[in-house]
Amino acid sequence: MLSINQLMKYLRNHHQISVKSNQAQSLRNIGYYHGYKGYRFIRTPNQRIPFSSLDEVIALNKFDMQLKTLIYPKVMFIENALKSYVIEAVLQDSKSENLDVVFNKSITAYQSYAPGSQQYHKQYAKRMTLKGKINNALLRDYSNQKQTVNHFFDTDRPIPIWAVFESLTLGEFGTFFACANANVKLKTSSILHLPSNLDSDGKITEYMIYAVKDLRNAVAHNNTIFDTRFQTSTINKRLISLLET
C-alpha cells in the first residue's frame, strides 16, 4: 500500500500527471483508487481521458459531485411520488392494505396469459421470485431493527403494503409494478395523466421506474455519473416517444 506522497510521485512518474506539492489533501479527498482511477476514463476503461494535471481530475470530480447534488432530490422525489401513486392504485384495486390480499387480488399480471403457455409460466415465476425478494427485504430490515417493519412483526400484525414499499429497492418496486394487473397499471397511468394513446396498457410507469433506477442508485451510492456509466439497460422507445411529444 502506497502512502499519499508515494501516490503523488506515482502519478507524476507513471501517469505523467502534474501534481502540486500542496495537493496531498485534495488527492486524499477524491481518493486515488476510487477517485482518480474512476475518473480517468469515460464509460469504459479503454476510453481514457488524457489528464495532464491533478487540477483537471479535481475539476471533473467537482463537476460530478455538483451533478449529484442537483439530481439527488429530484430522483428521490420521483421515487417517492411513483410509490405513492402505485399504492393508491393498489389499494383501490385490492380494497386492502394487507400484503397477502394485495398479492392475491392485484399482483396477477400472469393471469392475462393462457394457462400453461410460455408467458404464463414466465410471469408466474416472476411473481413468485418477487414474493421471495419482498420476504428477504422485510427480513433484512427486521434484522436491522427498522421500525416500520419491527412495529408490525413484533406485535404479530400483518404488514401493510405501504410499509413493504419502504423496504423495497427501486428495482424490486419495478418488478412489483410489472407483476400488477391491468387495473393497477391503468389507474396509475390515470393518476399520472399519461396520454391513453401512448399508454393503453399502462406500462409506461414501469418504463419510468426502470429508466430512473440506475441513476437513482448511482447518485444514492455516490458513484460516478457524469458519463452515464451506471446505465445497465436502454430506455424503452415508448417512453422516449412520450418525452418527445
Located regions from the model:
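Acidic/aromatic/glycine-rich contiguous surface patches that form carbohydrate-binding/processing clefts
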Residues: 222
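Extended intrinsically disordered or low-complexity regions, especially N/C-terminal cytosolic tails and loops
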Residues: 1-214, 226-245
